[in-house]
Amino acid sequence: MANILKKWIESDRRELRRINKIANKVESYAKQMSELTDEQLQAKTDEFRERYKKGESLDHMLPEAFAVSREGAKRVLGLYPFHVQIMGGIVLHEGNIAEMRTGEGKTLTATMPVYLNAISGKGVHVITVNEYLSKRDATEMGQLYNWLGCSVGINNSEMSPDQKREAYKADIMYSTNSEIGFDYLRDNMAVYKEDQVQRGLNYALVDEVDSILIDEARTPLIISGPGTGTSKLYKQTDRFVKQLKKDVDYKIDLESKTVSLTDEGIKKAEKYFNLKNLYDPENTALTHHLDQALRANYIMLLDKDYVVQDGEVLIVDSFTGRVMEGRRFSDGLHQAIEAKEGVEIQEENKTMANITYQNLFRMYNKLAGMTGTAKTEQEEFREIYNMETITIPTNRPVQRKDEPDLLYPTLQSKFAAVVDRIKKLHAKGQPILVGTVAVETSEYLSQLLDKENIPHVVLNAKNHAKEAEIVKNAGQKGAVTIATNMAGRGTDIKLGPGVREIGGLAVIGTERHESRRIDNQLRGRSGRQGDPGLSQFYLSLEDDLMKRFGGDRIKAFLERMKVNDEDAVIKSRFLTHQVESAQKRVEGNNYDSRKNVLQYDDVMREQREIIYKERQQIITEDKSLKWVLMPMFRRTIQREVDQHTLGDKKDWDLQGIVDFAEEVLIKPDTITVKDLEGKSPQEMVDYLMTFAQGVYKEKQKQLYDPAQMLEFEKVVILRVVDSHWTDHIDIMDQFRQSVGLRGYGQLNPLVEYQTAGYHMFEQMIADIEYETTRLFMKSEIRQNVTR
C-alpha cells in the first residue's frame, strides 16, 4: 500500500512539473499581450481560428491563447489568473480533472481552456449543477468571451426548441447536466431533423465534476409516456406491510439497506392475499409491489430520502440535500411511497428513452472537470471516464485547523455538545457553518438553537431557492448557518469585516457522511485563499454510519475503556480510524454498485447507439430510403423462407410461405404452392423479392413526387422503429429487475443479461424489419400523413 501511495505522489509531482513548464510558457507571453491595444488583443481570436483551419493544433496554440484569455480577463473582469490557475486550466484542456480547493477561483480557471477550445468552432459545453450557477457564470464570464469574439449561449428547461438550437450553435454554452441529457434523448426521439437541437458532443467542462459523474452516476435520465399501472395494488400491499412486525415478519439488512419477508411474513402474505405460493410465477406483479411497499415503509425515510410538499412526494438528493424537482423514483417505488404517505398515487410511466450520466458524458470527444474534492475517487475517474485527477497547489498555504473528531455515546449528548460549542463561538462573533446529513436533523438542531435564543438560518431541501444568498452571508460576523449536506456548492463563503481576527469561519459537522469526499467538501468551506478557520466533526454511536458499520467494535472499545457516562466524550485515533474504514467500505460498495450499473447499462448503450444511428440516417436522408428498405424486405423474406424450408424437402412447409406472402407482401390468390414447387430456397427468396420490388415501384408511381415518396418511407420506418424500441426498453428494464433473482445455480446475472439482451435485440430487429415490410406493402397511400 505504501509503495502504491509513493508511486501516486511521485507521478503527481512529475505531472505538476510538466504542467508548470507549460504554465511558465503562458507567463512568458504576459508582457507581449499587455502591450497590445484592445483591438489588437481581440483580433487574436480570428487569427487563432485561421491557424486552426490551416492545421495548427490547439495544444500548440495553448500558451499564446491562454495568455490572450488571461489579459482579456484583466481588462474586462478586473481579474488576472494566478500561476496555479493557469496550471488548472492546462489540466482541464487536456481532458482531466483539476482538484482545486474551495475559493481558489475555479470559474476563472475555466475561462482559459474554454476560450482555447471555442477556437475550433465545434462547441464547448460548460456544465453546472443547477440553473442558477449556469446563468450566473454565463453572465459574468460571458462578458469576457463576448469581448474576445466568442458567442455564448445558455441552455435551460424553460426554453423552446428554437432557443435551444441557438444556444447549442454558440461557441460556448452553459447548461445543467440533466438538460444536456434530456436534449440528447429528445433529439433521438425527434421525427424531423428541424426538431433536433444539438450539434454533436465535442468538449464538456464539468463544474463540481464529482457531484455529477460520481454522486449522480446511477441516476438514469428517463423520458416516459403513460403506462398501464394500477394504484389499487399499491394501496393493498401498503395496508398489508404496515401490519408487519420487525424481525418477526420482515428483516432489515442495515449494511446493504435492503428489507425482505421472513418465512413468517411469507405465510402471512399468502393468507392475506389468499395464495397457495407467494412466489409462483403468476404472482410476480404482487411480489414486486410487496418489495416496493416494504422498501417504502421500512427503508425510505420521510425528510431524509424524500419530503412531502403540497400533497406530492419529492425526492431529496442524498448528497446535496436539495429537492430534485420533476424526478421520480423508478420501478414503482415512488407510487409505493405515495401509498405510504396517503397522497394521490400518480400512474406508473412507461420508459420511452433513457441514459445514465456515465454513458452520456462518455460520448463527448473530450471531457474535463473541476472540483474541490476528487482525489478519493481518482480510481473511478480513471477506470470509467479515462480521466486523471491532478491536485493543483493552493495559491496561499491553507491556514484552517482541522480538529479531531469527538465521539459521544448518544445523539442527545452529541447535540448538547454541538449547541454548547455554537454558544461559545457565537459569543465572540465567530461565524459558524453547521453541516447536517438530513433535513430532520437540521430542523431538530434549529429548535435547540431557538431555545438558546441563538439567531440562525436553515438551508435545506425545503428552501433551496434562497441558498446562494444564505451561503454568501454565512461568513459575516455572528452568522450561524445550518446546511443540509453541502447545499449551496458553487457559491463562495467570503469572510466579513473583522472575522479574520477572531479565527475565520468555524465549520461543525454533526455526523460523518458515508463519503469522505462530502466531509472534505464541508471542511473546505472554511479556510479559502489562506483565510484562518477551523473544522470539527461531532459523532455519536447512534449515527447511521456507526450503526451500519463498526458500531459493535466501537462499543466494545468503549466498554474496555470503561466509558459509561452519557455525556462522556472520546477523542481517539482508533475511533477516527474506525470511522474512516467504515467510510471506505461504503465508498467501495457504492463504487461497485456504480460499476455494476455501468456494466448493465453498457448492454443498452450499444443497442441505443445502433438504433439512434439508424434513426439519424433515416431522419437526415434527403433523396430516397430505397437503400434501407430493399435489404429489409430481402432479410424478412429470407427469414420466413428459411423457417419454412428446414430439414428434408418433403418436410418443407410451402403453404406457410404462401400464407406469409399473402399476409405481408401481396394480395390474396396472387401465388399458390405450385408456383414455389421445384424452386430452391434461394430461388423462392428471389421470386418473392420481385413482388416486393413491384409494389415499391407501384408506390413510387402513386406518389409521383420523390419528396412525398421519401416522406412516406420515413413515416413507415420511424413509426415501427419507435414503437418496437420503446417496448424493448421496457422489456429490458423488467428483465434486468428479474435477472438478479437468477444468481443461483452458478449463473452470473450479468452474463445472463448480456446474452439474453443480445438475443432480445436481434429479435427486435427482425420484428422491426417484418413489421416495416408489412406496413410498407399493405398500407394505402393517403396524402398528408404525419410521422
Curated annotation (Swiss-Prot):
Its EC number is 7.4.2.8. It is found in: Cell membrane; Cytoplasm. It holds the Pfam family P-loop_SecA. It catalyses: ATP + H2O + cellular proteinSide 1 = ADP + phosphate + cellular proteinSide 2. It is an enzyme of class 7 (translocase). Gene3D superfamilies: Helical scaffold and wing domains of SecA (1.10.3060.10), P-loop containing nucleotide triphosphate hydrolases (3.40.50.300), SecA, preprotein cross-linking domain (3.90.1440.10). GO terms for biological process: intracellular protein transmembrane transport; protein import; protein targeting; protein transport by the Sec complex. One of its GO terms (cellular component) is cytosol. One of its GO terms (molecular function) is protein-exporting ATPase activity. CDD domains: DEXDc_SecA, SF2_C_secA. Keywords: ATP-binding, Cell membrane, Cytoplasm, Membrane, Nucleotide-binding, Protein transport, Translocase, Translocation, Transport. PROSITE patterns: SECA, SECA_MOTOR_DEAD. ATP binds at Q85, G103, E104, G105, K106, T107, D492. It is a peripheral membrane protein. Belongs to the SecA family. Part of the Sec protein translocase complex. Interacts with the SecYEG preprotein conducting channel. Has a central role in coupling the hydrolysis of ATP to the transfer of proteins into and across the cell membrane, serving as an ATP-driven molecular motor driving the stepwise translocation of polypeptide chains across the membrane. NCBIfam families: PRK09200.1, PRK12904.1, secA. Monomer and homodimer. Part of the essential Sec protein translocation apparatus which comprises SecA, SecYEG and auxiliary proteins SecDF. Other proteins may also be involved. This is Protein translocase subunit SecA. The lineage of its organism: Bacteria, Bacillati, Bacillota, Bacilli, Lactobacillales.
